[in-house]
Amino acid sequence: MNMLVVENGTILRGPELTPQRKNLVIEDGIIKEITDERAPSGERIDASKLMVCPALVNSHVHIGDSVALDVGDGRPLEDIVRPPNGLKHRILESSPPGMLMEAMRNSARDMITHGIGSFIDYREGGPEGVELLREAIGDLPISGIILGRDPVVFDQEASRAEIRRRVRGVLRVSDGFAPSGMGEITDETASIIVEECERAGKIASIHVAEHRESQRRSLEDTGMSEVERALNAGFKLLVHLTNPVREDLKLVRESGASVVLCPRSNGALSSGIPPIRRMHELGINLLLGTDNLMFNSPDMLREMEYTLKVTRGCARRYFPPVEVLRMATSNTSAFTGTGVIEEGFPADLILVEKLSGDPYLSIINRTESKNIIYLIIKGKLVKR
């Protein structure tokens, strides 16, 4: 039995991240007990001057883009990322596997350095692309939830049987399936993807409403927004929702789907800023991700600070910082199984210096990598 005790820390406990001065008893990677009592044995960390926060979760990243940092700046979004012939796809296809692996591994190390314990990756390249990423991070102390894709979904002439076969092939090695967007696939293909993910008990996710033009095309071609079509197909994890139209947000709320926000990426690509405050008011479960490494570092500390300030600026109203920290931690638990400090959950934690009297703003506004004193993943101390 491996035991680690974190003593006297200010823990951000439960889904609401409630500050409490407690001791954490960790056994075999799991939080066994949260208590006022002193544990009788085990390796100890004195956290009396530290805050204990769930390790951060990057809920949307394309780590394969690590081979194309800052390429294509200023070009139209579709020229850069739209499959199958966007700039990034051409670069990925022409990059040797060894180069891709090294770049992805370096980006994973960067995430670890910045307190990230888990990430959800949207991986191109079919089953081989998924397996390449698994190999790249296999011995690193970070959990990769890898959603794959296959170019067959873009083929208008592919049979239902062929699409189903290829989707199943990806799902055999991945944690889910995530096509680029509703603008590149038919509604029938979208339904097949969701059906196969549900059958396998895996995640079905898709980009929607990232920019106005894709929404306009969807309305003209189908009479429905990208969001409506994605929800009709049954997707439960939507990415971006930067430019909702009509009743999009209410439909998302009614469906129970979660939304991954990527405001730094949206800003970099001049796509707009999602209506974050309105989504929160409607009760939509919001997650946060850094998106393409082409445009952004995979740093959730920077993502949180940008999110808080741009949300307040766009709404011209106060927005609680705890809600932004929840986007990067506890709101992700349904998809990652982490992000919550509570008995029975995995011990994925960061212990950070208290830099101000407000625990949430201290992390969001002021914490840098150097202020993360300990990173604990599955109950083990991680060297950064």
From Swiss-Prot:
The keyword Hydrolase applies. Zn(2+) binds at H60, H62, H207, D291. Pfam families: Amidohydro_1. Its EC number is 3.-.-.-. Keywords: Hydrolase, Metal-binding, Zinc. CDD domains: archeal_chlorohydrolases. The keyword Metal-binding applies. One of its GO terms (molecular function) is hydrolase activity, acting on carbon-nitrogen (but not peptide) bonds. NCBIfam families: PRK07213.1. Belongs to the metallo-dependent hydrolases superfamily. ATZ/TRZ family. This is Putative aminohydrolase MTH_994. It comes from Methanothermobacter thermautotrophicus (strain ATCC 29096 / DSM 1053 / JCM 10044 / NBRC 100330 / Delta H).
